[in-house]
């Protein structure tokens, strides 16, 4: 008994030492999307705080392309020591279904480290659209089938898939118009009439009266737009949320993941960071790495069904 206990204690020493020594050098956080997007801003907020807390630089590296798959694969192939991390989100979980010939399995080859937060999208219409509520919009769309254009940030994008889910649940016929660049200019001009967009991209136009917010996509109202109802108040069961978190290559030491999880949860609980995230429409979401892994798998399955049912193809 004493020998077994002693062996266990000795085995724990390297693991404890490894956690204490981490990070031993610069840490790269790969953001698989362009600089300036909400995911990039979230990564920089968290990275700066981790740099201060752990006394090593956490550097953001934007590695874009293929719907986020290029940056994600670079993390899959990285040395699993905790010094290369991934800023990941809902699109990563969706890509598992959207892309048929990936060179990696996101669910199996990226270890969940820590969740950062979740963010509603907002259903917005051009101010010329006569509908002022979701029920009015549904009635208007059904009276004008195939005459209303729904913009998105690309075929297979989060905004596209959220819109397709709305179409499936309400029976409306909207014409999807994907954009490689921003959809906001054409939404403002009326070339497209409705978009499921990020709050951060739309809020200044909502407050300026150029766009009308009909609903947010989460089950609870947003603190940023508390007067705007949820879609679920009118479309029973509709719930959709963008989310962000940190991942690492599989086989990253468990003690490193635990340390990062603890540190990231502390970062997102800090009042200043919470306020900065709130400005982006992001609500902190804290959970263990294991719980985060279950959450990601559930999201991949849920949105995979929508993608298959609507026969959505990535660009």
Stretches found by the model and what they are:
Residues 13, 17-107, 147-149, 170-196, ...:
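N-terminal (or domain-start) structured segment
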Residues 24-26, 169-170, 254-315:
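An extracytoplasmic/periplasmic, membrane-proximal ligand-sensing/linker region
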Residues 1-19:
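N-terminal export signals
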Residues 92-101, 165-169, 194-227:
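A ligand-binding cleft/hinge motif common to bilobed small-molecule-binding domains
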Residues 77-83, 97-182, 231, 236, ...:
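Hinge/capping helix and adjacent helix->loop/strand transition within the periplasmic-binding protein
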């Amino acid at each position: 008994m004493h020998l077994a206990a002693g062996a266990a204690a000795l085995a724990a020493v390297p693991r404890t030492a490894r956690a204490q020594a981490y990070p031993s050098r610069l840490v790269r956080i790969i953001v698989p999307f362009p600089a300036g997007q909400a995911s990039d801003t979230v990564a920089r907020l968290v990275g700066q705080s981790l740099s201060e807390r752990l006394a090593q630089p956490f550097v953001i590296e934007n590695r874009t392309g293929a719907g986020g798959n290029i940056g994600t694969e670079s993390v899959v192939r990285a040395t699993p020591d905790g010094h290369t991390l991934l800023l990941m989100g809902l699109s990563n979980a969706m890509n598992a279904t959207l892309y048929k010939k990936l060179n990696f399995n996101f669910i199996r080859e990226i270890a969940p480290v820590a969740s950062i937060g979740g963010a509603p999208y907002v259903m917005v219409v051009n101010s010329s659209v006569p509908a002022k509520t979701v029920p009015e919009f549904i009635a208007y769309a059904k009276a004008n089938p195939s005459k209303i254009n729904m913009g998105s940030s690309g075929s297979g994008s989060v905004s596209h898939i959220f819109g397709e889910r709305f179409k499936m649940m309400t029976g409306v016929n909207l014409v999807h118009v994907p954009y490689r660049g921003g959809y906001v200019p054409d939404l403002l001009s009326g070339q497209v009439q409705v978009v499921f967009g990020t709050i951060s991209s739309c809020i200044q136009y909502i407050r300026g009266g150029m766009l009308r917010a009909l609903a947010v996509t989460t089950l609870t109202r947003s603190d940023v737009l508390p007067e705007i109802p949820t879609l679920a108040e009118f479309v029973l069961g509709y719930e959709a949320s963008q989310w962000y978190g940190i991942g690492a290559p599989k086989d990253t030491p468990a003690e490193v993941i635990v340390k990062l999880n603890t540190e990231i949860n502390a970062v997102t609980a800090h009042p200043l960071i919470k306020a900065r995230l709130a400005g982006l429409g992001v609500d902190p979401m804290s959970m263990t790495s294991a719980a985060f892994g279950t959450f990601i798998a559930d999201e991949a399955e849920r949105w995979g069904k929508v993608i298959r049912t609507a026969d959505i193809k990535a660009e």
